[in-house]
């Protein structure tokens, strides 16, 4: 689902020069998509239109530079908290050093979303089954 208000804000605003105040990482099937949805409804929080930028885990995206990452935050207000949700940051060891490098002066808060492993595995099985995989 596309948030049209967010799309309008991003299309006419200059790129952001701010890094996120917080990152949310976590296990698959641990409600990161739901959290992203609810946080986008809060007027004091700004999240990228796409939930997972994959910037710190994807070699091609990372090679495009920090400016490419900051483009995802175009339209953030001065008073808004800036965040990103990407579960994969928890699994890719290189992401930690990349985040540490770029956030050296102002480390973000990092929120981990976890779920009971048995319930998570069953939920993943059901999703895979529904998709016919």
Task: Enumerate the language-model features and the residues they cover.
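A short acidic, amphipathic alpha-helical/loop segment
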Residues: 95-98
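PAPS-dependent sulfotransferase catalytic core
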Residues: 1-91, 101-113, 117-133
